[in-house]
A protein has these predicted regions:
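Membrane-embedded transmembrane alpha-helical bundles that form the catalytic cores
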Residues: 1-366, 370, 376-414
């Protein structure tokens, strides 16, 4: 994170304020049988959503124009949870009357930093929320340890490789190292976020919440569209249900579909941050999704190998736009990736071998866990004595790493 000067704002009070306001805003459409007109109910829904969205937009833009502004932790996540709750109440006419239970949903501590974005209906269906069971706690602990290992032993270590590249300077790296950096950052972000999601699932299991899947082996995808159906699945489904489909989805012709997709992806970029590079990242993904939908999608389905290569080539490139905050720096990095008009590979030719040697275990481990068969085998056999012993080693080695390393917060906590 940047070096930030903390403002005199109590973020827990902000969250409590948002909960209270949302509880009050439910009243105009709590019961569909009440004698309120549809127009009035829509008005109050719009006011409710606007109040929540305004807070998020304010802090996203403040973080761009005021470098010393510290974002409230998890604001992107609990704001979306709040909006989804309000819309679901509007659609169903059923609201939660208990402020305590609603607060437990909005402030659910395992999910507050980086999600997943749970719907209220999922929590409402959790019949044993708050009920302790030893078997469930044991299963949850395994998820927590697996997530901790992903974060500490893979993501944080691969983050050092990306930090090395930034320290060297994009102008001074060779083309092979530029590609290694793109691959390392892609895996760092994945294991950091997927690791947190597993920890959240594990804690949720312990306290009786449903296991909400947020990742499904995205790097095994055969298109960018499929990749984002498997990556941060709760965010993707949120945009589908509360923005894309209400805009008309793909039901109003090709031009409207293209517009809806581009708008959704632009908003997705802004959700991650108000910086121009986030918006650009979202628009690039939107264009790729449109191109796949209109033209190349049918060709990707014909060749499993070529479609996988396409995803593994394109996705790391988009992550570079996501990771690098200024357009000039993005241009320099891409000039190193594609040295058609410059020295490229001739710059510092020994840097690739040096960095590769330092991070071989993490790169190999990351690649293995990106293979669906390997990951599913580990998940299926998580009660096997060998897997349990491996988790024991992972836990203590992770503790050792954390005790001897600088603090590395979860990357999505910044969003």
């Amino acid at each position: 994170m940047r070096g930030l000067r903390r403002k005199n704002i109590n973020w827990s009070e902000l969250q409590l304020f948002e909960e209270t306001v949302d509880q009050r805003k439910e009243e105009p459409y709590r019961n569909t049988a009440s004698p309120q007109t549809v127009k009035k109910r829509k008005f109050w829904l719009a006011v409710s959503v606007l109040c929540n969205a305004s807070l998020l937009i304010f802090f996203k833009l403040s973080n761009v124009f005021e470098e010393n502004m510290l974002l409230p932790v998890g604001i992107s996540f609990y704001t979306f949870k709040s909006i989804s709750y309000l819309i679901d109440v509007y659609r169903s006419g059923h609201a939660e009357r208990s402020f305590l239970r609603f607060g437990a949903y909005l402030c659910c501590f395992p999910q507050i930093v980086s999600g997943p974005i749970m719907r209220y209906g999922e929590m409402e269906q959790a019949q044993q929320f708050g009920v302790w069971k030893a078997a469930r706690a044991e299963d949850g602990l395994k998820y927590i340890i697996a997530g901790l290992g992903m974060k500490v032993l893979l993501a944080d270590r691969l983050g050092f490789l990306w930090n090395d590249i930034q320290t060297i300077g994009f102008e001074s790296i060779s083309t092979p190292l530029a590609w290694l950096g793109a691959a390392a950052y892609s895996m760092e972000l994945y294991f950091d976020f997927a690791g947190y999601s597993l920890i959240a699932v594990g804690i949720g299991r312990m306290i009786g919440l449903p296991a909400i899947k947020n990742f499904d082996q995205p790097y095994s995808s055969r298109s960018v569209s499929e990749f984002y159906r498997r990556w941060h699945m709760t965010l993707g489904s949120w945009f589908r249900d509360y923005l894309y489909i209400p805009l008309g989805g793909n039901r109003k012709g090709t031009l409207r579909t293209v517009f809806n997709l581009l708008l959704v992806w632009a908003v997705t970029g802004f959700w991650h941050g108000g910086g121009l590079h986030f918006i650009l990242w979202g628009m690039i993904l939107g264009l790729l999704v449109v191109i796949e939908k209109l033209w190349i999608g049918k060709w990707l389905k014909k060749s499993k190998i070529l479609s996988h290569v396409y995803v593994l080539f394109v996705i790391p490139l988009t992550w570079m736009v996501f990771a690098i905050p200024t357009l000039p720096e993005i241009g320099v990095y891409f000039a190193r990736l594609f040295p058609f008009f410059g020295v490229g590979s001739a710059v510092n030719p020994g840097d690739f071998a040096k960095e590769l040697t330092l991070f071989i275990p993490e790169l190999v481990g990351g690649i293995l866990l990106c293979i669906p068969q390997v990951y599913r085998w580990c998940e299926k056999h998580r009660k096997n004595v060998i897997v349990v012993a491996a988790l024991f080693v992972v836990f203590w080695y992770s503790v050792y790493r954390m005790a001897n390393a600088a603090n590395n917060p979860f990357m999505y906590a910044n969003f």
